[in-house]
Amino acid sequence: MITKPLKVALFPQEIFWKDKASNIDTLIRLMPTIHPETDLLILPEMFSTGFVTGDKEEVRALAERNTGKTIDLIKELASQYGFAIAGSFIADTGGSLYNRAFFIEPNGDETFADKKHLFTMAKEDRVFSRGHDRLAVRYRGWNIAMIVCYDIRFLYGVAIKIMNTT
């Protein structure tokens, strides 16, 4: 049951293409500017690398596992600032690459979902594998869909999932 509004902050950072260190530094530097009453901070798609497609091995070099440095940092920041953080990163499962959404809660709970509708005009489908699950997170009484960018154009299935999340 929803008991209060959810205060959401968007983080429209300048993305340095393929430059994880600069993108992570920007996030760390600007975190103190986020309003302290924020409940959820939403980062851009592939916030740590920029939207990268093209050569699969080049993309793989930028990828991480769910237990990599990027997610470890997001967990640390969510705990430190007391709000959930959502976004996406390039995930490597040891074989396939995914544009993977994350939702990290201040208590360390984590949820991951892979982008389902890959953007063929940017050749995303040639590099990344498609996700299959439609996931929603229950956070502070709200059902929040785990979708990435182009997935938003296909909301029917997302709406069904949100309505059925308890």
Where are these regions (language model features)?
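Cys-nucleophile CN-hydrolase/nitrilase-fold catalytic domain and related Cys-dependent amidase chemistry
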Residues: 20, 28-106
